[in-house]
Every structure is written in C-alpha cells, then in structure tokens.
C-alpha cells in the first residue's frame, strides 16, 4: 500500500512520470482500500476537486471520513467543512464542530478558528454534546503495513 500511495503521488505531482490525475487516483484507491490513510485523503481530494473529470462530493466525504477515523487531521478538517456546508453529506453544525474539535486537539490551527466561529452558532446544549462526542473520539487502529513507518511512529507517539 505504501508503494501504491507513493506511485499515486508521483502521478499527481509529475515526479518521474508524466502527470496523470486518473492514474494517480487509481493508485491512491488501491492503497486506500488497503488502509493507507494518506491515500484515502488524496483520493478524497481528487473526488472533491474533480481531478478525475467530475466532482463527486459524496465519495469525497466517504474517503475523508475513513481517513478522519484513522486520525488524519487534514481529513478531519475537510470532513468538518463538508458537514458545515452540507456538501456531500447532510449539513450538520454538530458534526462539523465535532470534527473541527478533533482536528484542533491535534494542533490544527484552521480548525481552532472554525471552532470559534461555530461556537457562536450553536447553543450551549448542542456545543456540549459535540464536545463530548469529540472528547470520546478514539482513532481507529492504523495498519502498520499500509502506512509509512514514520506515520505509524508519529501516531503511536514514538
């Protein structure tokens, strides 16, 4: 999965091969289906941007959700944005707040800013429920074989 992710990156960034968004997405999907969270994120970005020809926000949300569940803060932030806008998922300020809070807990500065904005839009009860949901969030176990070793070491706090 790691090699597939890296090959997808090469096709996306025109590194050693001719840039080809469709081939990049193909390799990202293979790696993502094996549990590579960065490939999941990049595949979601490809769906969201229309890099493969047509935007598919529901698929973007699905892949952002999977990577977010594996603890990737960039995907947590992007998933929160989708919930806030109702883009590819039903609009839910509670879910947006939850995912911003989870990403903010990992140090994501943009998520911290969005939390401040959403705090003014949610009532105290809703905000407390979203905070409780975020506080209880356990990232799913990360497959060591599907992710880059430094990624696993960082997740484990090593």
Where are these regions (language model features)?
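Extracytoplasmic cell-surface/polysaccharide-interacting catalytic and binding patches
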Residues: 26, 62, 142
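Soluble non-cytosolic domains of exported or imported proteins
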Residues: 22, 58, 121-124
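Terminal, low-structured helical/coil segments at or just beyond the last alpha-helical repeat
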Residues: 109-158
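Generic detector of solvent-exposed, compositionally biased contiguous segments
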Residues: 46, 58-82, 145-158
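Short helix-capping/linker turns of helical repeat alpha-solenoids
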Residues: 1, 13-15, 20, 28, ...
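Hydrophobic face of amphipathic alpha-helices that form TPR/SEL1-like repeat modules
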Residues: 4-13, 40-49, 53, 76-85, ...
């Amino acid at each position: 999965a790691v090699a597939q992710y890296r090959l997808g990156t090469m096709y996306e960034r025109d590194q050693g091969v001719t840039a080809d968004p469709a081939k990049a997405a193909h390799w990202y999907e293979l790696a993502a289906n094996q549990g590579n969270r960065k490939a999941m994120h990049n595949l979601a970005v490809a769906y969201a941007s229309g890099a493969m020809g047509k935007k598919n926000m529901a698929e973007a949300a699905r892949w952002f959700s999977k990577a977010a569940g594996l603890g990737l803060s960039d995907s947590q932030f992007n998933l929160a944005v989708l919930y806030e806008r109702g883009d590819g998922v039903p609009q839910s300020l509670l879910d947006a707040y939850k995912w911003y809070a989870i990403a903010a807990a990992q140090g994501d500065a943009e998520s911290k800013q969005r939390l401040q904005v959403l705090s003014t839009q949610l009532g105290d009860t809703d905000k407390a429920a979203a905070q409780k949901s975020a506080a209880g969030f356990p990232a799913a176990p990360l497959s060591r074989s599907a992710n880059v070793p430094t990624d696993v070491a960082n997740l484990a706090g090593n």
